[in-house]
């Protein structure tokens, strides 16, 4: 299930009658939290931001999904509605698969199922990191953790920061927009990062890791 532009896993070929491709423009909703979930979605190319609404117009950004990753997997395991929302960060092509057919596919292909479990483990690890940051980090630490995640090597060629607003970054850190802007400027003055428009370049990754770890 590695990134392979414009292709789908071989296992999907068995699901000709149960899958379809859809294109989403950058900024377009792929699905909304609480909506009926008849499909699992596989990203063929592009990027999607997933988030959860927390009430009073606020949200927490969870992760960025890229080509070769799935969205809406909870549908396969009994959830009748999507637990999160997903929005395309740029033009994104997905393969939508009927959740019942996808569940049958997993039963018939053990190796494919194990790959999916491995990917789900990474997503679970990401959720644990978010919970840790929310519970233990101060605002600087939360922002440092968010920047480290968004600059991970898996996004090396994606120019992620160009696709995100400052509000998006604040929502990854679960802090206010005002606090996000203020601490970004502080990090810049401390030569931890360099700001250039929307771009954020890390100048001192070890210092950023230290801020993230210490909270």
Positions of PLM-derived features:
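Short beta-strand segments in beta-sandwich/barrel cores
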Residues: 20, 29, 47-52, 70, ...
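Polybasic "coupling" helices that flank or enter modular domains
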Residues: 107-176
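Regulatory nucleotide-sensing modules
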Residues: 2-41, 45
């Amino acid at each position: 299930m590695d990134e392979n532009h414009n292709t789908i896993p071989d296992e999907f070929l068995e699901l000709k009658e149960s899958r379809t491709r859809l294109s989403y423009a950058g900024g377009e909703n792929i699905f909304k939290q609480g909506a009926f979930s008849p499909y699992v979605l596989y990203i063929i190319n592009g990027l999607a931001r997933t988030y959860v609404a927390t009430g009073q117009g606020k949200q927490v950004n969870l992760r960025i999904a890229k080509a070769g990753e799935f969205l809406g997997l909870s549908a396969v395991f009994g959830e009748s509605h999507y637990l999160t929302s997903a929005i395309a960060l740029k033009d994104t092509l997905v393969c939508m698969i009927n959740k019942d057919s996808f569940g049958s596919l997993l039963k018939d292909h053990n190796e494919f199922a194990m790959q999916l479990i491995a990917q789900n483990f990474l997503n679970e690890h990401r959720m644990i990191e978010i919970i840790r940051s929310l519970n233990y980090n101060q605002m600087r630490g939360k922002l440092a953790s968010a920047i480290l995640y968004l600059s991970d090597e898996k996004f090396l060629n994606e120019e992620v920061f160009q696709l995100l607003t400052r509000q998006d970054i604040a929502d990854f850190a679960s802090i206010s927009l005002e606090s996000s802007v203020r601490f970004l400027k502080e990090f810049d003055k401390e030569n931890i990062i360099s700001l250039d428009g929307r771009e954020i370049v890390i100048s001192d990754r070890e210092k950023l890791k230290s801020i993230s770890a210490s909270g």
